[in-house]
From Swiss-Prot:
This is 16.9 kDa class I heat shock protein 1. Keywords: Cytoplasm, Stress response. GO terms for biological process: protein complex oligomerization; protein folding; response to heat; response to hydrogen peroxide; response to salt stress. Its main location: cytoplasm. One of its GO terms (cellular component) is cytoplasm. GO terms for molecular function: protein folding chaperone; unfolded protein binding. May form oligomeric structures. Transmembrane segments: none annotated. It is found in: Cytoplasm. Pfam families: HSP20 (PF00011). Residues 37-151 form the sHSP domain. PANTHER family: HEAT-SHOCK PROTEIN 20 FAMILY MEMBER. The gene is hsp16.9A. It comes from the Eukaryota.
């Protein structure tokens, strides 16, 4: 059985030439204990926006269950999103024509700014999108004291 992966769906000619690193990639997973199938999923797409009240992270995790995701804060200011998407069980009688969905472990880390209230982080998973909200501490405006000028 052979599985055909298209490396770039926007370039139909990308698969015409052999990748000189394919041999290396097939060896590396055995050494590192990983899987070449995790490569695309390891780079889960993330949007990070800042609002006046919070930092909001949106992570695309299609097909991942809530129980397969962890959201943590390490070292006081590093947001870590990690987890694993299980591989579909294979039946010996199945014939695969294309495998494009990734499986395996993933991890993303983000250094949070100083104004992040890490003790109030909230996360929710809906429709394959993980939303992590990190509230911001209120920035106190410096007090201005008028000084009377004598003379």
């Amino acid at each position: 059985m052979s599985i055909v992966r298209r490396s770039n769906v926007f370039d139909p000619f990308a698969d015409l030439w052999a990748d000189p690193f394919d041999t290396f990639r097939s060896i590396v997973p055995a050494i590192s204990g990983g899987s070449s199938e995790t490569a695309a999923f390891a780079n889960a797409r993330v949007d990070w926006k800042e609002t006046p009240e919070a930092h909001v992270f949106k992570v695309d995790l299609p097909g991942v269950k809530k129980e397969e995701v962890k959201v943590e804060v390490e070292d006081g200011n590093v947001l870590v999103v990690s987890g694993e998407r299980s591989r579909e069980k294979e039946d010996k009688n199945d014939k695969w024509h294309r495998v494009e969905r990734s499986s395996g472990k993933f991890v993303r880390r983000f250094r949070l700014p100083e104004d992040a209230k890490v003790e109030e982080v909230k996360a929710g998973l809906e429709n394959g999108v993980l939303t992590v909200t990190v509230p911001k501490a209120e920035v106190k405006k410096p007090e201005v004291k008028a000084i009377e000028i004598s003379g």
